[in-house]
């Protein structure tokens, strides 16, 4: 039984979040939570909370939480319309500072 949890518009760059998603994809859910608890990357707490939410969703649906593994972990780029600022540049110009926004989706499934 597939259970899903997502976090939209997370204020983390997609490239950094993908590194963490690649780290946990295919692992057991409890192993991934344990691994992310000790990972020093900036996106680790965000992904850990999403995995915990997906496990709780699976438990609500009646799945065996000891048999859960992360079947799918995707990180997509969100819109850059939030958190835009301007940096002064030479000759009266300005360049835009954009902060990355991510859409993170985690799916857990039971091992057969």
Swiss-Prot record:
PROSITE patterns: RIBOSOMAL_L22. It comes from the Bacteria. GO terms for cellular component: cytosolic large ribosomal subunit. CDD domains: Ribosomal_L22 (cd00336). Signal peptide: none annotated. GO terms for biological process: translation. GO terms for molecular function: rRNA binding; structural constituent of ribosome. The gene is rplV. Keywords: Ribonucleoprotein, Ribosomal protein, RNA-binding, rRNA-binding. Part of the 50S ribosomal subunit. PANTHER family: CHLOROPLAST 50S RIBOSOMAL PROTEIN L22-RELATED (PTHR13501), LARGE RIBOSOMAL SUBUNIT PROTEIN UL22M (PTHR13501:SF8). This protein binds specifically to 23S rRNA; its binding is stimulated by other ribosomal proteins, e.g. L4, L17, and L20. It is important during the early stages of 50S assembly. It makes multiple contacts with different domains of the 23S rRNA in the assembled 50S subunit and ribosome. The globular domain of the protein is located near the polypeptide exit tunnel on the outside of the subunit, while an extended beta-hairpin is found that lines the wall of the exit tunnel in the center of the 70S ribosome. This is Large ribosomal subunit protein uL22. Belongs to the universal ribosomal protein uL22 family.
